[in-house]
Design a protein with these regions (language model features):
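Active-site helix-to-loop segments that bind/position phosphate- or nucleotide-bearing substrates
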Residues: 27, 39-178
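Glycine/small-residue-rich interface belts in oligomeric ring/scaffold proteins
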Residues: 2-56
Length: 179
């Protein structure tokens, strides 16, 4: 059944899809992701069907205090680094190398544990010569694709909760969407 679908990725430029199907997917909170001619996700369909909790959620989101944002960011970074550690373990690498980073994240990640851990993570996973870049050599394109799919899944969950993914906590720039 359609309600069991979490995500549909439309990659091929020759795809034909009907409006009733798109409406049914959106109605069932399916993340419909559209890709460009390089098969990179560029956008996602979202429901504009307003409900009473959406307005309340948006008001709450806009009113979040700076200390609360910093604590939320701290928790996100701790989880991100802990998950990177788990990936290293699954890849047969030393997962404990990231422990000092996720155990010492400060409010708002004021001393950039995320960035420091990322360097250690990527070097551990792919070797010291690997450089993580938006348009870099492989496997960057695959990582970027996966990241776009994950970002769409998070956006879907936020939208489903009445929150706007565009109003992030930090990481605001043209190239990096709000987080």
């Amino acid at each position: 059944p359609i309600e069991d679908i979490g995500c549909v990725v439309l990659e091929n430029q020759m795809i034909n899809i009907t409006l009733p199907l798109l409406n049914e997917l959106v109605k069932n909170n399916v993340a419909v992701i559209l890709c460009d001619n390089k098969m990179m996700p560029t956008s996602m369909l979202q429901s504009l069907d307003a409900n009473t909790t959406q307005a309340e959620s948006l008001k709450f989101q806009l009113a979040v205090s700076e200390p609360m944002k910093k604590q939320a960011w701290k928790q996100i970074i701790e989880s991100k680094i802990a998950n990177q550690s788990a990936v290293l373990g699954l890849a047969g690498k030393n997962k404990d190398i990231l422990k000092p980073y996720y155990n010492n994240v400060k409010s708002g990640d004021s001393d950039n544990r995320e960035g420091l851990a990322a360097k250690v993570y990527w070097n551990s996973l792919f070797g010291n010569s690997f450089k993580r870049e938006r348009d870099g050599c492989p496997p960057n394109a695959l990582l970027n694709y996966g990241y776009a799919i994950l970002r769409a899944a998070v956006a879907r969950a936020l939208l489903g909760s009445g929150l706007l993914p565009n109003l992030g906590i930090f990481h605001k720039s043209r190239d990096r969407k709000s987080t």
